[in-house]
UniProtKB/Swiss-Prot annotation:
Source species, domain of life: Bacteria
Organism: Mycolicibacterium smegmatis (Mycobacterium smegmatis)
Protein name: 12 kDa protein
Length: 24
């Protein structure tokens, strides 16, 4: 379940991605 930890760590970035255009 290491992937879950990654998603949790990137959670804030995901929220920003939803409020802002793709910053990738």
């Amino acid at each position: 379940m290491f992937h879950v930890l990654t998603l949790t760590y990137l959670c804030p970035l995901d929220v920003v991605x939803q409020t802002r255009p793709a910053h990738v």
